[in-house]
């Protein structure tokens, strides 16, 4: 079996419906992640993401995938960077997390930065291959999950809470 299949064929562990795993690139979307964290906390939901995982002693990818398995819902927030690539699979960590969440049967809620949003050059994928992969990933999220666009931090937080109001008890 391939590296990706190895990650998604194991049976999912018991999940907590009030735990939400938030996946995105870090440098360009840290303020957006913080706004989601605050909104979830105000609703009594637990935010799980790379912030708490990076400090664990095990391999970050394995830790991340374990946290996704325990979450009740997976949220993808995608801007204009494909992000760091996992050497074992060739996928960005955000896309790898998405593939794992789908493989585990998690509800997926996806948000994409609107094309009208102004971004700094540092927030863009500089490599052509990364940008093409980003566009393909965005298309997958739109097609398979009806991804919703956002224009800024506050807009994203509102739309996340609206979407979760329909899917989290």
Q: What do these predicted regions represent?
A:
Residues 50, 77, 111-113, 150:
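Generic beta-sheet signal
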Residues 47, 106-108, 147:
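Hydrophobic anchor at the start of a short beta-strand
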Residues 2-77, 102-104:
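Conserved N-terminal substructure of TIR/SEFIR domains
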Residues 27-29, 55, 81-84, 116-118:
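Short acidic, S/G/P-rich loop/turn micro-motifs used as interaction or catalytic elements
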Residues 55-60, 80-104:
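Conserved TIR/SEFIR loop-to-helix hotspot centered on a Trp-containing motif
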Residues 103-116:
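A short helix->loop->beta-strand "cap" motif at the edges of active sites that frequently abuts
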Residues 36, 64, 94-97, 133, ...:
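A general structural detector for well-ordered alpha-helical segments in enzyme core domains, enriched
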Residues 1-14, 114-169:
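C-terminal interaction surface of TIR/SEFIR-family domains
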């Amino acid at each position: 079996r391939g590296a990706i299949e190895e990650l998604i064929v194991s049976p999912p562990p018991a999940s907590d419906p009030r735990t939400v795993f938030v996946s995105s690139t870090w440098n360009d979307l840290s303020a957006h992640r913080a706004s989601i964290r605050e909104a979830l906390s105000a609703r009594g939901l637990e935010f799980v993401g790379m912030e708490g995982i990076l400090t664990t002693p095990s391999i970050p990818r394995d830790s991340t995938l374990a946290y996704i398995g325990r979450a009740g819902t997976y949220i993808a927030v995608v801007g204009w960077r494909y992000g760091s690539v996992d050497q074992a699979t060739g996928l960005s960590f955000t896309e790898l997390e998405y593939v794992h969440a789908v493989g585990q049967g998690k509800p997926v809620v996806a948000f994409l930065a609107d094309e009208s949003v102004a971004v700094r050059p540092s927030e863009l994928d500089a490599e052509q291959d990364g940008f093409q992969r980003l566009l393909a990933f965005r298309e997958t999220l739109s097609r398979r999950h009806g991804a919703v666009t956002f224009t800024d931090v506050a807009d994203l937080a509102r739309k996340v809470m609206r979407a979760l109001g329909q899917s989290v008890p």
